[in-house]
Amino acid sequence: MVELSEKVSGLIYQLRIFMPMEPGYVFSYIVKRDNECVMIDAGYPNAELLNPLINELSKISNCRLSTLFITHMHIDHTGLANELRNRLSLSIVMHRRDYEQVLKMLDRDLFIKEFLELLGQYGVPNAEMELYRNVTSGLSSRRRLSALNPDVLINNEEEYIERMHVLLTPGHSPGHISIILDEYKLAFTGDLILPTITTHVGLTPINPGNPLRDYLNSLIRIRKVDLKCLYPGHEGEICNVNDRINELIMHRVSRLCEVVNTLRNNELTIFEITNMLKWMDDKKYVDLDPMNKYMALTETAALVKYLESIGIVKAGNDYKYGIIREIMCDIRELIPQ
């Protein structure tokens, strides 16, 4: 259920923590310098995992654990934060932008209301509304099961805390952070960059604005840091850092072009575009389970928002989008370099 392994001798330890949803586990990390330790992320909210997690932590010798960094607000990264603080007297650190969204989710009725209003703009038919009401209600309920009350809120795009270089890298969430060990050229990137999975970037009430633009800028920001390896929240370490970042950028270019091609001869709502794209395992929207329908719809919304922001598409009064500037779907037309 919880497994400890040493990733970089005497410096980085990884905790593999079970969770009951894909991909089945999440990583937390311990960074040890001298006898001082900090923890990065707090696993899934399952009280039965708390004692096994603490037992695994005790296997790291001469490790005075003082601080818990939260890379982002999602419950598989915040789950046991309060319990760990209570048992180990930790200080919890996260970015203010994410904490503000945590507070928003705790008001379930308001959260559902805002999302249903957004669905109207996405062109979702009434027949689908109950499905999305249930999904958003479930997200809010799970959030309340894992209440989070940080001790330190990061306010800036870049800070140094406990000798850790913290960068704001939004997109997956508004206040997602990456944590860099400058002297080793190593970083902990939460869900920003994963080895084979493409991170969900969706436009929702708790990830507002232009999240795909934020995500692409975050990838480019990390690419400029010159890192040897990344330690993400799932799958495994990444040591072909820039190659993987370039793959992820090209994946988004491909998806943006799919949206553009879908709109070449039609004006469509975001819901209609979502139905015309292929999703996980090459499935159509209609074949997805409710949670993956939510992810597909909100990802399409983020793609369309990005295209709108660079002047390629525009919506009419009926929320149907059409092309207003033709492009060849070249990366230089779509992505800031």
Identify the meaning behind each predicted range.
Residues 11, 31, 41, 72, ...:
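Divalent metal-coordination and catalytic microenvironments
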Residues 37, 44-46, 140-142, 165-256:
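Metallo-beta-lactamase
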Residues 48-49, 56-160, 274:
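Active-site HxH/HxHxD metal-binding segment of metal-dependent hydrolases
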Residues 2-59, 178-195:
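Conserved beta-strand hairpin/beta-sheet module of binuclear metal-dependent hydrolase folds
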